[in-house]
Amino acid sequence: MSASKIPLFKMKGLILFLSLVKMSLAVPAFPQQPGAQGMAPPGMASLSLETMRQLGSLQGLNALSQYSRLGFGKALNSLWLHGLLPPHNSFPWIGPREHETQQPSLQPHQPGLKPFLQPTAATGVQVTPQKPGPQPPMHPGQLPLQEGELIAPDEPQVAPSENPPTPEVPIMDFADPQFPTVFQIARSISRGPMAHNKASAFYPGMFYMSYGANQLNAPARIGFMSSEEMPGERGSPMAYGTLFPRFGGFRQTLRRLNQNSPKGGDFTVEVDSPVSVTKGPEKGEGPEGSPLQEANPGKRENPALLSQMAPGAHAGLLAFPNDHIPSMARGPAGQRLLGVTPAAADPLITPELAEVYETYGADVTTPLGDGEATMDITMSPDTQQPLLPGNKVHQPQVHNAWRFQEP
């Protein structure tokens, strides 16, 4: 190996390693408490989509990464989010929002009202047993006032929520130099989202990363990684092939995936024949007696197959972008055998699936008057006709009822 190839090889490995480290750092996932309704089972870091939309407006979790002084979409944003880096005071627009100031707090009014509230609170203890008079209006679900408990006249009335905030979690403010720790954020998340009077936006506090990995292949932007947006079911692990579609080693069928397409493809390929799973058609080994093998190697241009060719089939569904698939049979002049089913034959296949089926062999159609030359191993040996060399497409054979036409 020459000396010029060694640094390039090391650089590729370093880039791959840093990309994997960035992926592991840029996805914050917090485990939920076991037994909570609607949450993942214990030990699985999964958040539902609706929970994360409400958690985006939770105090301390609206730290958007595009406001980071470290740059847009950097891997150290999660360190800043977890409180391992100093808070961001360089941007004036980072501060408590309107819905974050709705919590009942007497801290701004305390210096002026302190000498006035103390005697009233002291006399309130003596007066309250004697007055059964008008009580303050009670909301449903609110406990009655205890002895010595008054409502400040300047305090805004807040509608009670179903889960009132516990006093153990302090109010998180970005103007405060003391940033919340990891345990406070995790405790806030395990407590659940806080209910606000004002309806929040559709995606209130989502931050964006520089790659697209959700199910619909969003235009290279996703927010909190949700298990409902992952390619699998709830709580299933993500594949590296969907996170890094440009790496050909992880998923061969994703090497020409467009990341900015508005619709993502369904990357599941259903093969009906169990033999073709082990023997891939891309290697030219389909099921025994398959129509792909029945084309005579000596006679490439089969008139029976060419008569079934749809005009403009290559410009339709099964288009080959690079036009250099070595597993396809070619004629003497270098042309491929054109036995492709037209795009209108299968209405279930969308144009996004054309990239997925490109590594599989073309669907070679047979004339309607001829049967398929398939080998049925369940039939008795005397019912099978001997296979003769030559063009085996036109030889009548026993039709296998269990073999369906592959997509």
From Swiss-Prot:
GO CC term (a single one): extracellular matrix
Record keywords: Biomineralization, Extracellular matrix, Hydroxylation, Phosphoprotein, Secreted, Signal
One of the protein's GO biological processes: odontogenesis of dentin-containing tooth
SMART domains referenced in this protein's UniProt entry, alphabetically: Amelin
Modification Phosphoserine, positions: S48
Region: Disordered, residue numbers: 124-143, 259-304
InterPro entries xrefs: Amelin
Modified residues (Hydroxyproline): P42
MF-aspect GO terms: extracellular matrix structural constituent conferring compression resistance; growth factor activity; structural constituent of tooth enamel
Superkingdom to which the source organism belongs: Eukaryota
A family per Pfam: Amelin
Organs and tissues of expression: Ameloblast-specific.
Family the UniProt entry places it in: Belongs to the ameloblastin family.
Name of this protein: Ameloblastin
Species lineage: Eukaryota, Metazoa, Chordata, Craniata, Vertebrata
Chain's gene name: Ambn
